[in-house]
Regions:
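Ribonuclease/tRNase effector modules and their secretory precursors
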Residues: 2-121
């Protein structure tokens, strides 16, 4: 049964990642979100990915509701982790001249990091 579920599970497509990237740019403007790193693409399009297009849109919708906090964090730190309690998704970002470059994406309830964390729901 588990194999059947894995076969039926839809992977996020590169086109959908592009759509999420554009959506994130809109809700977090003037910060430019970049989801194109190889590791992020591998995590989202790989067989073991449990992250859906809808969950990514939800993540950035909720993060957009905390845009001021996100920008404040981004102005203070070179790296931050955005953590969504609802989806349990964590995205570490590197701050490169007003560009938020996603390092990876993972679903983990108690994600541990020395990097400052912005948690939202």
């Amino acid at each position: 049964m588990i194999k059947l579920i894995n076969i039926l599970k839809e992977m996020v497509t590169p086109d959908e990642i592009n759509q999420v990237d554009n959506f994130a740019d809109q809700v977090l403007s003037p910060v430019d979100v970049d989801l194109s790193s190889k590791h992020v693409l591998d995590r989202l399009t790989g067989r073991e990915s449990d992250v859906t297009f809808e969950q990514l849109i939800g993540f950035f919708t909720r993060l957009g509701q905390h845009k001021k906090e996100f920008i404040d964090f981004f102005e203070r730190y070179n790296e931050i982790v955005a953590t969504d309690r609802k989806s349990k998704l964590n995205i570490p970002f590197i701050n490169l001249t007003n560009k938020a470059i996603a390092k990876t994406i993972m679903r983990k309830l108690n994600f541990l990091s020395d990097t400052p964390k912005l948690t939202f729901e």
